Amino acid sequence: MAERVLGNVATRLLLENERVRIWAMDLAPGARSDTHRHDADYVLVQIEGDRIAAMPEPDSAGPYTAYIEADVVPGKARYIRRGGIETAINIGERRYREILVELK
């Protein structure tokens, strides 16, 4: 069986140094992110959008095993612990944007 290749946690890397990696996620309505694993704790700040979903992979472990849908709250910041293999899906009618700060 071929080894699975995972993508990035967001669509564009903005900055990386010895302490953080800062990413931008930008998804058009109906678009999906790369399937990715969160190997670091991170802070997620929603910027724009109306509905977002996370679809876990079958081998995702811990608290990250259920499909979730959520309303987007622009300006809302959340601290999230590492773990999970997922794909983000913009299930809304508006463009979805977020900033994701991985903590090293």
Across the structure, where does each feature detected by a protein language model lie?
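Ligand-binding loop in jelly-roll beta-barrel domains
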Residues: 73, 81-104
